[in-house]
Amino acid sequence: MEHREWFAPEEDKDYIKSLLSTHTGIIWKAIETVSGQTAGLFIVVFPGKNSENLGYDIGLPEAELCSVAHMDTVAVHPNFRGYGLQRLLISQAEEALRKTQYRYLLCTVHPENSFSHSNMEKLGYTYIKQALKYGGLPRCIYLKKRT
């Protein structure tokens, strides 16, 4: 995988299985219709009051932590990059979350990942701060607050 350091260390098949089996995450997949190949995927995580909740990093009150959704992981196959698939997947997830209690949409982006920084800003996310996350890795935290 290109730029492995842009991803958190725990993002593997076991991580995904755990999210699905505990109902603490949802996955969106984009499938190329002719070949059936996975073009991209996007994971949303519902951290609750887990210590990894990015709400703690931005100073949300305890009562708001269960309103946080992590716009967690996006991966687009190299053959499908450049078509806006990352933004499309995130937009689909946001639409699905629109009528839920999740008002604080938070994500992290590696400081050198200019593509994701640009996409998050185009989607209306605001840069909040840089912090060390995932065992000491530098990450920029973005927030989109829904009313």
Model-derived regions, located:
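Conserved active-site alpha-helix within GNAT-family acetyltransferase domains
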Residues: 87, 99, 111-129
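Conserved acetyl-CoA-binding loop-helix of GNAT-fold acetyltransferases
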Residues: 76, 82-95, 118, 122
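Active-site rim helix/loop that mediates acceptor-substrate recognition in acyltransferases
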Residues: 5-33, 43
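Conserved acyl-donor/pantetheine-binding loop and adjacent beta-alpha core of acyl/acetyltransferases
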Residues: 37, 43-73
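Conserved beta-strand-loop-alpha-helix junction that forms the acyl-donor binding cleft
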Residues: 78-81, 107-117, 134-136
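Conserved catalytic-core motifs of GNAT/GCN5-like acyltransferases
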Residues: 47, 108, 121-140
